[in-house]
Amino acid sequence: MLYRTYNEYKQTLQRLLHDWKIYFGATKADLVKNTCFVSHLSGDTAYADGVPIIASTTYQLIFLQDRQAFTNKRVIELTDDGVKYAGYDPASECNVFTATVTLYGPGSVPDE
């Protein structure tokens, strides 16, 4: 399923990970178990009639959890290339998983 807006995607993540905390950006104090961090990786611009518009935005998702296996199939399906194990983080005492997602159109950037 393609998500055209950041808010749509975040709402879906919140529904599927209802007992997790989800952050856009984070500080070290936010490192707790069952947490998903969303970080901006890149954005592409296109031009329509000489006017720049946001074509797409790519985000990195970082998941912290107790288990060494990420088994939420619905969340895996929401990513560009699946969810990958990155290792164990002794500071947070969590297993770390990463993924990327690309959202399309001007709504791919969150409203501030």
Give the predicted meaning of each segment.
Residues K28-L31, P90-T102:
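Short proline/glycine- and acidic-rich turn/helix-capping motifs at secondary-structure junctions
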Residues Y47, F70, S108-E112:
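Intrinsically disordered, low-complexity acidic/polar segments
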Residues M1-A46, V51, D66:
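Small/polar-rich, solvent-exposed N-terminal microdomains that initiate assembly or binding
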Residues D80-A91:
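Low-complexity, intrinsically disordered Gly/Pro/Thr-rich segments
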Residues P52-S56, I76-T79:
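Short intrinsically disordered coil segments
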